[in-house]
A protein has these predicted regions:
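GIY-YIG nuclease catalytic motif and its immediate N-terminal context
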Residues: 1-38, 43-53, 60-67, 84-86, ...
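Short arginine-rich
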Residues: 67-80
Length: 109
């Protein structure tokens, strides 16, 4: 069974901040961000809206892509988000369809 790795971008309601991360479980990780389970930057700035993600079979490629995106200026990151999600819609409801959602007491997946 092959694992999938994800590079994702999340923002807050006002889109003031844009966070880039990597995970092997996008559903679980988004749930953790939305519930404030991750101390630090994302909790402080209430980063809870998934606006972009890519998937990879090889973790080295995912790590490389995450580093690449983190090195970009904000304008280039915004343009990347808009290639998939021009309205900056929160994509997390799509992830949680048919699963225990963000209101559950434990993370889905």
């Amino acid at each position: 069974m092959t694992k999938t790795f994800y590079v994702y971008l999340m923002t807050n309601r006002s889109r003031v901040v844009l966070y880039t991360g990597i995970t092997n479980s996008l559903v679980r990780r988004v749930w953790e961000h939305q519930n404030g389970d991750i101390e630090g930057f994302t909790k402080k700035y209430r980063v809870n809206r998934l606006v972009y993600y890519e998937n990879f079979d090889d973790p080295r490629n995912a790590i490389s892509r995450e580093k690449e995106i983190k090195g970009w200026r904000r304008g280039k990151k915004n343009a990347l988000v808009e290639t998939l999600n021009p309205k900056w819609t929160d994509l997390s409801p799509m992830l949680f369809q048919g699963m225990r959602g963000p209101s559950s007491s434990s993370p889905p997946g």
